[in-house]
């Protein structure tokens, strides 16, 4: 009988090299088809075994809580670890075909026939992100079906696919932000090789692929790390999602940094978007964000690391060495401008041409000003002068800003927003890095609602938790808020691809193609230097001017209700009169309500 291990035992020195595949936990196929090495770390179990294809085998202790066994089985073998007689899923599993509570499958990453050897990544300045939820992007909701849409995205003019989280989570549907087994791609979307095929196909078309990862919490069902060692977690801090991940524990750091490397190395993703980085709490000497950036940039090639962070901290780039930041202020000022809405966190924004001009010029709205919203009272943000324009990721819609509304309605479906205003939204012509959400380019009629698949008390708790989280928005108290656990809520959110070629959908799609073509081909707009940009306003007309050695471009967006002639707009410079684009497709220099033009 194996003796009880001390709390948080230290693995042998040979297991401190994170990059060495010979020290990986989980199931690792051996070279030449010689079998599979099964390995785990536990601080609590007295007896340890592995059950492979129904047969149980006692594992050998290597000291320091490490157990190992090599068996003559290959890819496709199913297994569970057995801790003190209890069958326990592997939190390092590379695939969980039957879900997060089931057996893992041995996966050999080396058998996929990659064809992207000539792909060397994408620079952030060249990125036009297109956010995709695999389950609702196509009727089938699979990796293979998503791959069939890649030629359309290439023709549209986007350059990088931003995939919502894929780490395995409980249930048959969900957004992905309740991942429980970080190393296993979500099985209902397809097998690991299907995901590899999606990335490979994108690279063949010249499209980058980025993955959204969640390293601030685990989902409420299906995470078994604490069964192996409670020290993965801590009560020194917590979040709305539960106990904190203890990044002072070397195995937790290794779990996350190794996971990041896996997505980039084994699946060929071009970069990662880190969800909610304010909640990646770490009191270690080197913050986990800094270590992640170092790990990713040392992989070779062009790999990018982006943060979703509302704090407006340039240090994320200048100190932690991340590459870019999903910022909220541009979206929030745009939404308040178009809708007049000032509930919840929108209360901190005033909207209008002047506010948008300031936000675009400075990168974000808050750079040290006082923030007093939702019970918070503090200075927010710091000046962003050290950042380049591409460091800011701008959007007018994303999964949160649509899905966290009571009915999951899109911006153009909001009260008071006309299609003229929606089409006039200017993010694609700014030097910041733009992001579109699936279907945005044709003003999709389908919502994107919050959905999950948790039964019983857990499902009820998730639903009630959302109402509490967004209690500052009056719509969440209504009886018409969709039930997140109902399958129909998920089905409602699937894109209707048939509508995009008709009526106003087709008209909007043509505009997005034209905007992205200009962004790509225009010699002035293609220059992303922030110092070339000036902004201002004349009443309700926002102007954004870009001047480079290649010429001058001026964007004018009428945010008022009165029609304005471009010649009548008072500007501190002479306005060029050559029309390059009118958001309503006209050939005149007149701005109706919500309309925009680009001149140069």
From Swiss-Prot:
- Signal peptide boundaries: none
Q: Where is this region: Disordered?
A: 1-34
For this record, the Gene Ontology CC terms, alphabetical, are: cytoplasm
Q: Which reaction does it catalyse?
A: hydrolysis of (1->4)-alpha-D-glucosidic linkage in 4-alpha-D-[(1->4)-alpha-D-glucanosyl]n trehalose to yield trehalose and (1->4)-alpha-D-glucan
Q: Which residues bind substrate?
A: 273-278, 328-332, 376, 399-404
- For the site Transition state stabilizer, which positions are given? 400
Q: Which UniProt keywords apply?
A: Carbohydrate metabolism, Cytoplasm, Glycosidase, Hydrolase
Localization: Cytoplasm
* Enzyme class, UniProt record, top EC level: hydrolase
Q: State the active site.
A: 275, 308
Which GO molecular function terms does the record list? 4-alpha-D-(1->4)-alpha-D-glucanotrehalose trehalohydrolase activity
Pathway linked to the protein: Glycan biosynthesis; trehalose biosynthesis
Query: What biological process terms from GO does the record include?
Result: trehalose biosynthetic process
Protein name, entry field:
Malto-oligosyltrehalose trehalohydrolase
Annotated gene: treZ
């Amino acid at each position: 009988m194996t003796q009880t291990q001390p709390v948080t035992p230290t693995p042998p020195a040979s297991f401190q090299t994170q990059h060495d595949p010979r020290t990986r936990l989980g199931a690792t196929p051996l070279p030449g088809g010689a079998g599979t090495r099964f390995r785990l770390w536990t601080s609590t179990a007295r007896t340890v075994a592995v059950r492979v294809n129904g047969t149980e085998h006692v594992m050998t202790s290597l000291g320091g809580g490490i157990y190992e066994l090599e068996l003559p089985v290959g890819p496709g073998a199913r297994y569970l670890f057995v801790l003190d007689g209890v069958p326990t899923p592997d939190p390092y599993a590379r695939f969980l075909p039957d879900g997060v509570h089931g057996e893992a499958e041995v996966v050999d990453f080396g058998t996929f026939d990659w064809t992207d050897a000539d792909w060397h990544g994408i620079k952030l300045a060249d990125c036009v992100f297109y956010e995709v939820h695999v389950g609702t992007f196509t009727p089938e909701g699979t990796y293979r079906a998503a791959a069939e849409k890649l030629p359309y995205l290439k023709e549209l003019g986007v350059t990088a696919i931003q995939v919502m989280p894929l780490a395995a989570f409980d249930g048959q549907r969900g957004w992905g932000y309740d991942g429980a087994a970080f190393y296993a791609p979500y099985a209902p979307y397809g097998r690991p090789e299907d995901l590899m095929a999606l990335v490979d196909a994108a690279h063949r078309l010249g499209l980058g692929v980025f993955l959204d990862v969640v390293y601030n919490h685990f989902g409420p069902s299906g995470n078994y790390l604490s069964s192996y060692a409670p020290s993965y977690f801590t009560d020194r801090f917590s979040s709305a999602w539960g106990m904190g991940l203890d990044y002072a524990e070397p195995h937790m750091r290794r779990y996350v940094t190794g996971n990041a490397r896996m997505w980039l190395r084994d699946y060929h993703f071009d970069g990662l978007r880190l969800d909610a980085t304010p909640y990646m709490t770490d009191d270690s000497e080197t913050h986990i964000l800094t270590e992640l950036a170092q790990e990713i940039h040392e992989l070779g090639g062009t790999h990018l690391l982006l943060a979703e962070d509302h704090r407006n901290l340039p240090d994320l780039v200048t100190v932690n060495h991340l590459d870019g930041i999903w910022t909220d202020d541009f979206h929030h000022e745009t939404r308040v401008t178009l809708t007049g809405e000032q509930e919840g966190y929108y209360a901190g924004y005033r909207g209008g041409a002047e506010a948008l001009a300031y936000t675009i010029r400075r990168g974000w709205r808050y750079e040290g000003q006082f923030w007093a919203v939702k019970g918070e009272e503090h200075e927010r943000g710091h000046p962003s002068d050290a950042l380049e324009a591409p460091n800011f990721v701008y959007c007018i819609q994303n999964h949160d800003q649509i899905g966290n509304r009571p009915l999951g309605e899109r911006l153009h479906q909001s009260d008071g927003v006309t299609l003229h205003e929606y089409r006039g939204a200017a993010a694609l012509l700014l030097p910041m890095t733009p992001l579109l959400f699936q279907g945005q380019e044709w003003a999709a009629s389908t919502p994107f609602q919050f959905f999950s698949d948790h039964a019983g008390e857990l499902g009820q708790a998730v639903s009630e938790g959302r109402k509490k989280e967004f209690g500052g928005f009056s719509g969440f108290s209504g009886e018409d808020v969709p039930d997140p656990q109902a399958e129909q809520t998920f089905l409602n959110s699937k894109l209707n691809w048939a509508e995009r070629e008709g009526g106003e959908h087709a008209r909007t799609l043509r505009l997005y193609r034209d905007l992205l073509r200009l962004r790509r081909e225009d010699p002035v707009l293609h220059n992303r230097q922030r110092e070339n940009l000036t902004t201002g306003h004349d009443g309700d007309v926002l102007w954004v001017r870009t001047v480079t050695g290649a010429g001058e471009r001026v964007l004018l967006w009428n945010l008022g209700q009165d029609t304005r002639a471009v010649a009548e707009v008072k500007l501190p410079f002479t306005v060029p009169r050559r029309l390059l684009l009118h958001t309503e497709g006209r050939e005149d220099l007149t701005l109706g309500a919500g309309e925009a033009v680009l001149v140069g």
